[in-house]
Each structure stands twice: as C-alpha cells, then as structure tokens.
Amino acid sequence: MMDIALLDEKLSKVLSEKRYTHSVYVSHTAVDMAKMFGVDINKAFLAGLIHDCAKYMSYDEMIDTAKRYEYTFDGMTLACPGIMHADVGALLAQYEYGIDDTGILDAIRYHTVARVGMTSLEKIIYIADMAEPMRDFDGVEKIRKSVDGGL
C-alpha cells in the first residue's frame, strides 16, 4: 500500500481544492462514525480519503481505466455515468494505490449507490460522503442527526 503521506499528496494534486477538502472532511467524519460504531478507524480514514480519487477523470478516462483493468460496469452505472467514479476509484485504489483490503475497496465502490447487505464500513462511507461538514443541502441536518440512532 502507498504511504498515507504520499497518497494524501497525490490526491491533493489530482483533485480540485474543493474535492480534496471534501475528501479530507469525509475521512474525518468517517473516523468519528467508526469510533461510534466500533469499526476500524484506519480503514474508515483511508476509505474516506480515497473515495473520490477518480472524480477528476473524464468519462473516456474512466472507460479506459476500466478496460485497462478488465473491469465491466453494470448496466446502472453505464446508464448513470455520474456514479462511475466510484467503481473506477476502487480500481485506482487497488491497482495504483496498492489497497488490497476488500472492505475498503467495497466502501469506495458503493459510496454513491447503496446495496443490500452493506457492511458497517460501507454504510459509514456512504453516510459520511453525504453528511460531512461542508455539505449544505435540504435534509443534511436530518442525515447528521440520524447517525446517532445507528447505521
């Protein structure tokens, strides 16, 4: 696995300042939630930091990355390219950043679209992405408060 400091530096260069700041906030929110629910804080931090690592890529770059790693998108992802960065982010995390923990990879992969049977880590990243402190939309406070009731 790539050293955390190097990973952080790389992300700060490839992501916009706003996206990088969002990723940092997600990682901190994820750590806070992991502490609440007994989930590994290191995995929560890493998944939160990396979750949007492919967000800067164009559609064509994401398609090319998937082909390079022989990955096939499901129909929903192809129909909604705005969520494609989650699958590609998991590929980058695995093949370019050296993450081999399937729990972290799945938390990245499913941070945009929930699935049946999500792990606690997956739920944490899914919620932290929506509820981190920079987010400002109708209903965000309700999401933040609902965390106290459990995952």
Question: Where are the regions that the model predicts?
Answer:
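Divalent metal-dependent catalytic cores for phosphoryl transfer on phosphate-bearing substrates
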Residues: 6-13, 36-151
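A short, charge-rich alpha-helical start-of-domain segment used by transcription regulators
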Residues: 17-19
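Short, well-ordered amphipathic alpha-helical segments that serve as non-catalytic structural scaffolds
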Residues: 29-30, 89
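Non-catalytic interface/linker regions that flank or bridge core catalytic/transmembrane domains
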Residues: 1-3
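N-terminal glycine-rich anion-binding loops that anchor highly charged ligand groups
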Residues: 22
